[in-house]
C-alpha cells in the first residue's frame, strides 16, 4: 500500500481526513469525537529506522497495544514505533513490504484502541 492509497483507505473507512499539524508533509488521523490520534504518517530516512538503505521511507505509526506487539513486529514491513512509545505503537513501511490486508487490520485495531473514552478520575474523599 502506498501513502496515497493509505490516505484514501483511511479517509473512506473511518470518515476522517488527514490533518497537518506541523509545517511539513507529516500528518495525523484522529477521532472526531475524542480527538485522539490513531495514526501518524511521516517520511523519514531509512537509516533512522535501522534499515541500511539510502533514501526516505513513507511510514505510518499505529497504536497496537503491548499484547499484540511481538506478533506483528515479526511480519515483513512492520517495525517498532518510530518516534512514539514503542510499547504501544508500531511502524508500518508504506513501500509494499507489508501486506495490504494486514495494514487494514492494524488500522482497525488502532482505531478501536484509541476510540475508547478515558474513565473519569475517581474523586478523592475530602
Residue ranges of model-derived segments:
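Charge-dense, helix-prone N-terminal extensions
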Residues: 1-126
Amino acid at each position: 500500500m502506498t501513502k496515497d492509497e493509505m490516505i484514501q483507505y483511511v479517509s473512506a473507512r473511518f470518515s476522517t481526513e488527514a490533518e497537518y499539524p506541523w509545517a511539513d508533509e507529516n500528518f495525523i488521523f484522529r477521532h472526531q469525537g475524542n480527538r485522539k490520534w490513531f495514526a501518524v504518517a511521516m517520511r523519514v530516512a531509512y537509516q533512522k529506522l535501522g534499515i541500511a538503505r539510502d533514501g526516505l521511507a513513507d511510514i505510518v505509526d499505529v497504536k497496537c497495544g503491548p499484547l499484540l506487539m511481538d506478533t506483528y513486529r515479526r511480519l515483513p514491513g512492520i517495525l517498532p514505533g518510530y518516534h512514539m512509545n514503542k510499547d504501544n505503537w508500531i511502524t508500518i513501511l508504506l513501500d509494499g513490504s507489508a501486506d495490504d490486508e494486514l495494514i487494514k487490520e492494524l488500522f482497525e485495531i488502532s482505531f478501536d484502541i484509541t476510540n475508547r473514552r478515558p474513565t473519569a478520575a475517581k474523586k478523592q474523599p475530602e
